[in-house]
Regions:
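Active-site loop-to-helix "anion-binding N-cap" substructures in soluble metabolic enzymes
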Residues: 1-394
């Protein structure tokens, strides 16, 4: 995993450095409401500024149609927020590869920054179009990828352009690959993996890969009901994937054969409807009422999961235990987050997506060893899939 070239030690003075960042941040009324991803790119940006580079930042934001400018997807607020964070002027180009971008880049002095407009305003970005790659490459003398969140996409700005310029990894991307790669290649044991979320179908590859790597796998979230079905339990009106029951059973068997502990809920919080004001009850996992749905793990399960987490020396968590967005069903996710935070002996790695939202919600982010910035990218790396954005830097 260590064989990607990083920007550290590279002479960037006076060079136009084209940097793919992940500024896909939430914006409301023209203001960035969560700047986590912008902050995550600061070490690379500040390193380049200090080294005297002419820094050209490019990113996507949201899912525009790809037919040109759309006000709600402009990166202008992200550029403004970056300027506030580094306390320096940041130029903004009203296009990506057009006249304004070229003019703003030409006007840069060493150590100055321009942010280009949303890459995905041009549909050629997602198609990794050769012509578009060439146009991007003309804007820089070297290329840096620091957008781990999109490293699993073979787009023009993540893969195509890297073939046309001297290409390096930024500090964020290199750190992600090193941490997640190290976790898989040589984890301190016991290695405990906690997997939640609603669908087994989304996590099959990850669970399969972790059965080969982990000592204990903890299952929560909506997908636990497909596993409970595989064990022969009735799950009422809970979310279930009938087509995946057999596959879930195979994974339970594989774990058993490998001597991997696979923990499933022994009790669940059930509700009569999917709503904050639902009538709720706690019942054992083998006696769920036929007219109710499971929306969280129960207290007995919380205690068992917390005990297993406490034993880990490497703890990886991806996916909530229940519908933590609703107060009535947040307790299981909160209990797991607290258990992970409380394990001071372990390397604790939060694998992107909803788990990050959860540790932020419960104000526990600072207690974790490492929080991944990539949801899909972290999962694909854990699954053992090559990431186009990383492969392009080898």
């Amino acid at each position: 995993m260590a064989d990607i070239k990083t920007i550290e030690g590279v002479d960037v003075a006076g060079k136009r450095v084209l940097v793919r960042v992940d500024f896909n941040v939430p914006i409301k009324d023209g203001v960035v409401t969560d700047d986590t991803r912008i902050r995550a790119a600061l070490p690379t940006i500040e390193y380049l500024v200090k080294g005297g580079a002419k820094v050209v930042l490019m990113s996507h934001l949201g899912r525009p149609a790809g037919e040109g400018f759309e006000e709600k997807f402009t990166l202008a607020p992200a550029a403004a927020r970056l300027g506030e964070l580094i306390d320096a002027p940041v130029a903004f180009a009203a296009d990506t590869v057009g006249d304004d971008a070229k003019a703003k880049i030409a006007a840069l002095s060493n150590g100055e920054i321009v942010v280009l407009e949303n890459l995905r305003f041009d549909k050629r970005e997602k198609k990794n179009d050769p012509e578009f790659c060439k146009m991007l490459a003309e804007l820089g003398d070297m290329y840096v990828n620091d957008a781990f969140g999109t490293a699993h996409r073979a787009h023009a700005s993540t893969a195509g352009v890297a073939a046309l310029l001297p290409a390096y990894a930024g500090f964020l991307l290199a750190g992600e690959v090193k941490t997640l790669g190290g976790m898989l290649d040589d984890p301190k044991r016991p290695f405990v993996a906690i997997l939640g979320g609603s669908k087994v179908s989304d996590k099959v590859g990850v669970i399969d890969a972790l059965i080969d790597k982990a000592d204990t796998i903890i299952i929560g979230g909506g997908m636990c009901f497909t596993f409970l079905l595989a064990q022969g339990h009735e799950v009422g009106t809970s979310l279930k994937e009938e087509d995946w029951v057999e596959r879930a059973g195979e994974m339970l068997k594989k774990a058993e054969e490998r001597g991997v502990k696979m923990l499933l809920p022994t009790d669940v919080v059930v509700a009569d409807k999917f709503a904050e004001d639902a009538n709720t009850a706690t019942c054992t996992a083998d006696a769920m009422p036929s007219d109710m749905m499971g929306l969280d793990i129960g207290p007995e399960t919380e205690a068992a999961y917390a005990a297993a987490i406490a034993e880990g020396k490497t703890v990886f968590w991806n996916g909530p235990m229940g519908v933590f967005e609703m107060k009535a069903f947040e307790h299981g996710t909160k209990a797991v987050a607290e258990a992970v935070a409380a394990n001071r002996e372990a390397a604790t790695i939060i694998g992107g997506g909803d788990s990050v939202a959860a540790v932020n919600k419960f104000d526990l982010a600072s207690e974790m060893t490492f929080i991944s910035t990539g949801g899909g990218a972290s999962m694909e790396l854990v699954e053992g899939k090559p990431l186009p954005g990383v492969e392009a830097l080898r």
